[in-house]
Regions:
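A structured, charge-rich N-terminal accessory region that forms the first stable segment of a protein
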Residues: 61-69, 77
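A long, amphipathic alpha-helix that forms part
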Residues: 222-260
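Structural motif
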Residues: 63-65, 214-218, 261, 352
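A short, conserved beta-to-alpha structural element at the edge of catalytic cores
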Residues: 88-106, 285-305
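Active-site neighborhoods of enzymes that stabilize oxyanions during catalysis
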Residues: 290-395
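Acidic/histidine-rich catalytic neighborhood
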Residues: 268-294
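His/Asp/Glu-rich, glycine-adjacent segments
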Residues: 9, 14-48, 76, 81-92, ...
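Active-site metal-binding loops of divalent metal-dependent hydrolases
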Residues: 67-68, 266-268
Length: 395
């Protein structure tokens, strides 16, 4: 037996079959972000798109994506967000998908596919055969976004059906590798403030370029505030109040025959110092590991040749009760990623570890900035998976 200090202990019992506490896979095909994307197209009468969620039909649809606005967080702060909470009183949540992180969730929204179908499988994933990671937020000029994520986007499919599309988000994201991967074929409107985001979305809805319009608006400051200050902080609550006002102002300026939907890419939990397991301080967790991908609450662990079984056994032993640790084949079989296209399977770690509770596997030397975050996400817990689906219509 190996302790969390990395030292081997005498065996005190026979090795048992691994039976982790259950982490339920997202309900792909019934109530997840990719289902929302397809249903959104169906609501605009795009042929061939499954209307899983039964969204109201309209000529114009706006999807406001608030990064980090988990369902449980919203319900716990009703006084801070009265407008959104009023909508939530007659609505419910859907699930983000795994891992519950921006790269994966925005790609699910942008393609209508589960993570295993679009291949954007985490914050950092292996580039198979190259011995290096792709950080999908920062991207790498060596990687072609179209080759990495080749599926047609919802914006391309909408355009083929005569629907005008617009994506309103920070100007800094225009042309990024991630944007080109999940938002190809869209009219990108870069903004610098909440006011510009609101006005830009309303102007796009009223543009009259086509008889049907789809607008996606993305706001990321709630997530960044949660990362740096924590979701239990005053700063996070103040930022939530700004988000509530943003949604209210956007709603008051909707044109006729329009539907506004509000959702998020994931929730968030605060991780205390005593809940952090540092792989850079525990040699046993680094043994046999070629690359450490994913993020602190959803790890892709890529083993050196021939070491996958040993890495799996060690991670299970050291992280028992704190992380659910599966092999690649087990994670796929459990449905964590949805149906996985064969060409994307090697991007998944030889070992996949998802957090229970508030645990996190950090890497203080290799990932100093990420390891210092207070708010984190990525796993399959309810706090991270459930996101709101709020709807307001002028139809």
């Amino acid at each position: 037996m190996i302790g969390l200090d990395g030292q081997r202990r005498p065996e005190d019992s026979p090795r048992m079959t691994y039976e982790p506490m259950p982490l339920n896979p997202p309900p792909y095909g019934s109530a997840t972000l990719p289902d929302l994307a397809c249903s959104l197209l169906a609501s605009l009468r795009v042929p061939g798109e499954p209307d899983v969620l039964g969204l109201p039909r309209a000529d114009r649809a706006c999807l406001l994506v608030v990064d980090g606005l988990g369902w449980d967080l919203l319900r716990a702060h009703q006084a801070t967000a009265p407008f959104l909470s009023e909508l939530a009183a007659t609505a419910g949540p859907i699930s983000a998908g795994f891992p519950s992180t921006t790269v994966t969730s925005m790609s699910s929204l942008g393609t209508g596919l589960p993570p295993g179908g679009h291949g954007m499988l985490g914050y950092q994933v292996a580039r198979p055969g190259e011995g290096k990671l792709l950080n999908a937020l920062r991207w790498d000029p060596e990687v072609d976004p179209v080759a990495w994520q080749p599926a047609p986007t919802i914006f391309e499919r909408a355009a083929d059906a005569g629907v005008h599309t617009c994506y309103v988000a920070a100007a800094a994201f225009r042309g990024s590798g991630l944007t080109r991967a999940f938002a190809r074929g869209v009219d990108y409107r870069g903004v610098h403030s909440l006011g510009e985001l609101t006005a830009g979305a309303q102007e796009a809805l009223r543009s009259g370029v086509a008889d049907r319009t789809l607008v996606m608006a993305y706001h990321g400051h709630l997530d960044s505030t949660g990362h740096t200050s924590g979701v239990a902080s005053d700063a996070w609550r103040y930022q939530l109040a700004h988000v509530d006002k943003l949604a209210e102002q956007l709603a008051t300026g909707l044109p006729d025959r329009c539907v506004l939907h509000v959702t998020a890419d994931h929730g968030m939990v605060d991780v205390g110092l005593d809940e952090r397991i540092d792989v850079d301080a525990i040699p046993a967790l680094r043994a046999g590991v070629a690359l450490l991908g994913g993020e602190a609450r959803a790890r892709h662990v890529y083993a050196e040749p021939g070491a996958a079984a040993d890495v799996l056994a060690t991670w299970r032993e050291l992280l028992d009760g704190r992380m659910c640790v599966l092999s690649r084949d087990e994670a796929i079989a459990h449905g964590w990623f949805g149906e996985v296209a064969p060409e994307f399977a090697a991007r998944i770690g030889d070992v996949v570890a998802a957090s229970y509770g508030q645990a996190a596997v950090v890497a203080s030397r290799a990932e100093p900035q990420e390891s210092a975050l207070i708010g984190m996400h990525g796993s399959l817990t309810q706090d991270e998976q459930l996101v709101p689906l709020l709807t307001l219509t002028t139809v």
